[in-house]
């Protein structure tokens, strides 16, 4: 255990203590350091399993923080949509433009407290790089990153490491990779390398989506 390990006795409400005890009973440790401000982007990595969601949700309930999270809009269809939104979900269209990024950044800053959780891999399956949306959103809104990891090898859910982006993508991604070094998802071979996709050549035709 380290100085950031959270214990049930330190939590103020019964529901928070219960959520943390459930995590502890499952063998998990929760690390937490107070957030650096009222707005920011929580980057969650690695994301290789559906089990990440209930583990993360218990951590969210234990901390008593109303983290919002982003997921593709198709997951919000039907009766589950209302439940997903109640749990903090924000539906997004994956075809969204930079204009939509600016709009989301302003929406986040217009409220008193808003931290948005994003899985930069965008999928539980392997992909060769991270999606860059989290980076553009953080730099547009000028907010810090919270680097959350779900490490199945050590059974640690960590909500403790933060980073203020410099705007130098290479430098920033190296700093992010240093925090996540050695952290292992449930299916390690499905975790994406910690790097952003190279910029698209504007001369190439844009692929049409089905």
Region roles according to the model:
Residues 21, 58, 82, 106, ...:
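Surface-exposed charge patches
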Residues 4-6, 18-24, 43-49, 69-70, ...:
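Short acidic/polar alpha-helix capping motifs at helix-coil junctions
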Residues 1-10, 14, 18, 97-210:
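Non-catalytic C-terminal accessory region of glycerolipid acyltransferases
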Residues 33-96, 152:
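Catalytic core of membrane glycerolipid acyltransferases/transacylases, capturing the structured
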Residues 11-47:
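Helix-to-loop junction immediately C-terminal to a conserved catalytic motif
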């Amino acid at each position: 255990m380290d100085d950031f390990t959270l214990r049930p006795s330190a939590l103020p409400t019964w529901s928070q203590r219960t959520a943390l005890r459930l995590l502890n009973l499952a063998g998990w440790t929760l690390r937490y350091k107070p957030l650096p401000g009222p707005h920011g982007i929580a980057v969650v990595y690695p994301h290789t399993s559906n089990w990440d969601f209930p583990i993360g949700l218990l951590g969210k309930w234990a901390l008593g923080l109303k983290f919002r999270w982003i997921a593709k809009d198709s997951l919000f269809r039907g009766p589950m949509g209302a439940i997903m939104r109640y749990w903090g979900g924000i539906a997004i269209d994956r075809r969204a433009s930079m204009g939509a990024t600016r709009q989301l950044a302003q929406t986040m800053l217009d409220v008193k407290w808003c931290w948005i959780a994003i899985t930069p891999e965008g999928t539980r399956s392997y992909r060769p790089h991270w999606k860059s949306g989290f980076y553009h959103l953080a730099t547009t809104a000028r907010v810090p990153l919270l680097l959350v990891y779900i490490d199945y090898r050590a059974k640690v859910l960590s909500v403790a490491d933060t980073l203020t982006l410099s705007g130098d993508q290479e430098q920033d991604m190296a700093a992010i990779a240093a925090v996540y070094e050695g952290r292992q998802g449930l299916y390690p071979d499905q975790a994406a390398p910690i790097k952003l996709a190279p910029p698209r050549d504007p001369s190439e035709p844009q692929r049409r989506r089905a």
